[in-house]
Amino acid sequence: MNTATGVIALLVLATVIGCIEAETRADLQGAFESYEGEAAEKIFRRSPTCIPSGQPCPYNENCCSKSCTYKEMKTATPVQRCD
């Protein structure tokens, strides 16, 4: 076993031991059960984002300007882009 392999093995071992120790701590037991209902929804809810001007837009409501029009590209193919 060379030095690099030994270092990697020690890091893996330390990580495993740390995870086991964290699971047995009383202050972390049941930590995820406290996230119920609305609190859990807030964690996993996506924040509203909008598509900036000049970017392709699938729907008008996703554009920051709330406006999406067809524009002709160099290939003469019209593409919907945010205004």
Curated annotation (Swiss-Prot):
Annotated compartments: Secreted
Signal peptide feature range: 1-22
Annotated site, Critical for insecticidal activity, chain positions: 56, 81
Disulfide bridges in this chain: 50-64, 57-68, 63-82
SUPFAM superfamilies named among the record's database cross-references: omega toxin-like
Major localisation: secreted
Gene Ontology terms: cellular component: extracellular region
Entry annotated with the keyword Disulfide bond: yes
Tissue expression from the record: Expressed by the venom gland.
A Gene Ontology BP annotation from the UniProt entry: defense response
InterPro entries registered for this protein in UniProt: Omega-atracotox, Omega-atracotox_CS
GO MF annotation terms: calcium channel inhibitor activity; toxin activity
Keyword list, A-Z: Calcium channel impairing toxin, Cleavage on pair of basic residues, Disulfide bond, Ion channel impairing toxin, Knottin, Secreted, Signal, Toxin, Voltage-gated calcium channel impairing toxin
One Pfam short name: Omega-toxin
Pro-peptide region(s): 23-44
Job of this protein: Inhibits insect, but not mammalian, voltage-gated calcium channels (Cav).
UniProt domain comment: The presence of a 'disulfide through disulfide knot' structurally defines this protein as a knottin.
Family note: Belongs to the neurotoxin 08 (Shiva) family. 01 (omega toxin) subfamily.
Protein name (record): Omega-hexatoxin-Hvn1a
Organism: Hadronyche venenata (Tasmanian funnel-web spider)
